[in-house]
Amino acid sequence: MRHVRLPSRPLHHGLRATLAALAVATFGLTGLVGLQPARAAEPAGVPDTIEQRVAACIACHGRQGSTGNAAFFPRLAGKPAGYLFNQLRSFRDGRRSNTDMNYMVRHMSDAYLQEIADYFAGLDLPYAAVSPTSDAPPAQLARGRQLALEGDATRNIPACVHCHGAALTGVQPAIPGLLGLPRLYVSSQLGAWLTNERHALAPDCMAEIGRRMTTADINAVASWLAVQPMPANPKPVSAPAAPLPMACGGMQ
């Protein structure tokens, strides 16, 4: 292998020049130390509060868990704590499927999930204004109203109000309100029960109801619910007005 001899003088000269430059720079910087402004204080650490820890939820569910009707993601603020806790556990344990939710809660303990549920349940925030108009056909809205307020005895479908409260704002401790939710969210969840893609604690009453509904029924009730105004008091009622029409594992 041929050896190539590198010239020595330019290297030595370059090295001396580099060292000289470093010396000048070092001396110059040393002389300027006293003229530098005081170093800014280190920023405070991220506060370890529940508000900070649930910040990731806001990216999808909106400010403090309050979304508008145009969004796909459901509102969290003011929902019954028992309901939120059950849903978080279902995402963690695989009964509900959503890639982001499954990933975020997969290592969380029951105690931590309960803390998150309690936080969002305790938020008292106004609901976004609901547009009273719908592009759904009148017959579809009429069918949705029937299912929500009366049910369909011929198919053994109980009315939504029998479980979710007369005002459809939910019932403590674990039944959610159905108003103020995006139409697409409601229809997608009912559709997931219809196709056996969403599950809850046994006995899974909503899975039974979902399987008794047609896709037309699902679209009808979701469309009707989406345009209903919020009542003066949008909070969940303290207890059911009458015994539930069927057993639900989420209430145990």
Locate each region found by the language model.
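The feature marks the first
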Residues: 45-94, 98
